[in-house]
């Protein structure tokens, strides 16, 4: 732990917490810090100009990152008949109805995302207290309650990430791994920012994207100059 602290302190000394770094430099600094023995995730925190206490200003959605997340995702799907077959063909590891619900109630949750066809919500709705606290409850706002379960499965496998603003008005998301090329991380970040722009509440006033900061799993935050995101 002492070694980690020393490494973190050494990196922190290189970063001016008040400075806005061009995206290329910010990514370079973050990747430099990601020197742990595992492939650290590269995360982004976006401070939004919204009032998270107001229900009409809750920002929530999903986006498929063009370069993926670098993570293997196991998908469970509530569907029956033809839709169940389509889900399996699309790559879903677990497909079921009441049997899947019973597995979940028994604590057997070997999956990372749950997708549901609308006609199965009578079953899924009974699992809210189990799936909700784990962030696994299907929701149409993030595309996990849909009649097109096959596409939802493919999106999840392709690197779809869900986002939801927290109580402080901040969006937290992973845009890749330290092993990713800077161009891949940048394209993923751009896709996320574009999705956030599209999800902007009509009642949000003033500056919407207030602050953007990047960090690795074990690193410190590096603030990004938003003006450099559009530059190619």
Curated annotation (Swiss-Prot):
Highest taxon of the lineage: Bacteria
Classification via PROSITE patterns: RIBOSOMAL_L1
GO biological-process terms attached to the record: regulation of translation; translation
UniProt xrefs under InterPro entries: Ribosom_uL1_bac-type (IPR005878), Ribosomal_uL1 (IPR002143), Ribosomal_uL1-like (IPR023674), Ribosomal_uL1/biogenesis (IPR028364), Ribosomal_uL1_3-a/b-sand (IPR016095), Ribosomal_uL1_CS (IPR023673)
GO cellular component terms attached to this protein's record: cytosolic large ribosomal subunit
Role played: Binds directly to 23S rRNA. The L1 stalk is quite mobile in the ribosome, and is involved in E site tRNA release. Protein L1 is also a translational repressor protein, it controls the translation of the L11 operon by binding to its mRNA.
Family the UniProt entry places it in: Belongs to the universal ribosomal protein uL1 family.
Record protein name field: Large ribosomal subunit protein uL1
Protein species of origin: Burkholderia lata (strain ATCC 17760 / DSM 23089 / LMG 22485 / NCIMB 9086 / R18194 / 383)
């Amino acid at each position: 732990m002492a070694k980690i602290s020393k490494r973190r302190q050494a990196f922190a000394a290189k970063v001016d917490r008040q400075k806005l770094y061009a995206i290329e430099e910010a990514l370079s600094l973050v990747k430099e810090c990601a020197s742990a023995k595992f492939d650290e995730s590269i995360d982004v925190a976006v401070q939004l100009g919204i009032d998270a206490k107001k229900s009409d200003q809750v920002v929530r959605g999903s986006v498929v990152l063009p370069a993926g997340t670098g993570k293997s995702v196991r998908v469970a799907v509530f569907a029956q008949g033809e839709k169940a077959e389509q889900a399996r063909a699309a790559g879903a590891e677990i497909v079921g109805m009441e049997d899947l619900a019973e597995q979940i109630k028994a604590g057997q949750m070997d999956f990372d995302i749950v997708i549901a066809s609308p006609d199965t919500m009578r079953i899924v709705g009974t699992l809210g207290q189990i799936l909700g606290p784990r962030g696994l409850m299907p929701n149409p706002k993030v595309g996990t309650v849909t009649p097109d379960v096959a596409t939802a499965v493919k999106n999840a496998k392709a690197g779809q990430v869900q986002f939801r603003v927290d109580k402080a008005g901040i969006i937290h998301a992973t845009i890749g791994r330290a092993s990713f090329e800077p161009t891949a991380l940048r394209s993923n970040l751009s896709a996320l920012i574009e999705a956030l722009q599209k999800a902007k509440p009509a009642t949000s006033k003033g500056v919407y994207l207030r602050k953007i900061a990047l960090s690795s799993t074990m690193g410190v935050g590096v603030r990004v100059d938003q003006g450099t995101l559009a530059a190619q």
